[in-house]
Structure formats: C-alpha cells, structure tokens
From Swiss-Prot:
The lineage of its organism: Bacteria, Pseudomonadati, Pseudomonadota, Gammaproteobacteria, Aeromonadales. Catalyzes the conversion of uracil and 5-phospho-alpha-D-ribose 1-diphosphate (PRPP) to UMP and diphosphate. Its cofactor is Mg(2+). It comes from Tolumonas auensis (strain DSM 9187 / NBRC 110442 / TA 4). This is Uracil phosphoribosyltransferase. Allosterically activated by GTP. Belongs to the UPRTase family. Keywords: Allosteric enzyme, Glycosyltransferase, GTP-binding, Magnesium, Nucleotide-binding, Transferase. The keyword Transmembrane helix does not apply. Pathway: Pyrimidine metabolism; UMP biosynthesis via salvage pathway; UMP from uracil: step 1/1.
C-alpha cells in the first residue's frame, strides 16, 4: 500500500495550528478545508494530461488538460464533510458520494447507517476524505462498500493517521493509496490518535 505523508511546510504549519486545545470551531473548520485542499494537490499529482488545441486570445494555442479522469469525492459522515470543499475547489465537476459510518465508543467497531453512491462508481476514481485514520475500521468499511459497488480505483485523504490504522488498512486493502498530513504516535486505550486532533467532527461542527 502506498502511503504518502505530505511534508510541505504549509501543511505542517496548518496542521500544527489545528492541534491547539482552545482552537475555535471557525478556525478548525477553515484549516480542515485548507489542509484537505493541499493534500488533494498531492493526491492528484499523477493524473495524466493530454494536449488540446483551444482558441486563445490571439489564435489557436495548444494547452494541457486532464485526460478524461472521472472522480467522485467520498466524505465519510460527518467529519469528512469538513474536508470536502477543499477537494472540490480543485475538481468542481466531481460527483459526490456519501457514506455514513460511526464508531461504537465501546467496541470501537464501525457501524454503517447511510450511503448514497454515484451510479457509475465503477468508472470513477474515488477520493475518500476523513480527518482521522485511527483504528482504520470506518475506512475499511467504506472501502468494502465502494468495492462492492464496483469501484476499482481508490485514494484516501486524511489529516492524521495512526500506525495501527495504516497497518489494518494495509491488511484489508493493500491496493489503495493514502495521503496524510501526519503519521502520529499511535492510539490510546480509547482508540483516539495521540497527539491527534481530538474529536474532529465535534470541532468542525461545534458540538463538543
């Protein structure tokens, strides 16, 4: 499984700001979108381009355009919504598929409760977005679902990943690619990433 920890200074700086204990909902939400946007830039760096002739201001001109890439952005509810707009800034025509999965706080197991997937998922690259890859359970369940629907190309974009979650994802789906802003120390006894970001969903939606 390909894992890319993006070490760009802007990514590291913005992620560091997100770790502050007393960060406001507004600021956390803004930064989640910004870091998500920067990670998308990296995750799409292998897109193929082709030469196309267009009408320029002074006549025909040959330009590069992305070669027929169909994409669906897949935010995992609810926290993934906080990163979605940052991805769509770069690909405003991308379709959006939504998967609702929450983690049972006692068993730490993923519990699916909603899905709305584009009909031609088998023709599209899926960019799954979620702030945290902790145990990996929710991500694995989401990828299971997408593959059951016929999806063949999947990339994962997360702000912070735990080594335990990456190992679990590797064991379940070694054909995906993961792009993250940080691989953190690990999980505590409650399954939270340390140092992590806290509860990203609560911070994005102001429900903490």
């Amino acid at each position: 499984m390909k894992v890319i920890e993006v070490k760009h200074p802007l990514v590291k700086h913005k992620l560091g700001l997100m770790r502050e204990a007393d960060i406001s909902t507004k600021r956390f939400r803004e930064l989640a979108k910004e870091v998500g946007s920067l990670l998308t830039y990296e995750a799409t760096s292998d897109f193929e381009t082709e030469k196309v002739t267009i009408d320029g201001w002074n006549g025909p001109v040959e330009v590069d355009q992305i070669k027929g890439k169909k994409v669906t952005v897949v935010p995992i509810l609810r926290a993934g919504l906080g990163m979605m707009d940052g991805v769509l800034e770069h690909m405003p025509s991308a379709r959006v598929s939504v998967v609702g999965i929450y983690r049972d706080e006692e068993t730490l197991q993923p519990v699916p409760y909603f899905q709305k997937i584009v009909s031609n998922i088998d023709e599209r690259l899926a960019l799954i977005v979620d702030p945290m890859l902790a145990t990996g359970g929710s991500m694995i369940a989401t990828i299971d679902l997408l593959k059951q629907k016929g999806c063949k190309q999947i990339k994962v974009i997360v702000l912070v990943a735990a080594p335990e979650g990456l190992a679990a994802l590797q064991a379940a789906h070694d054909d995906v690619e993961v792009y993250c802003a940080s691989i953190d120390q690990g999980l505590n006894e409650k399954g939270y990433i340390i140092p992590g970001l806290g509860d990203a969903g609560d911070k994005i939606f102001g429900t903490k």
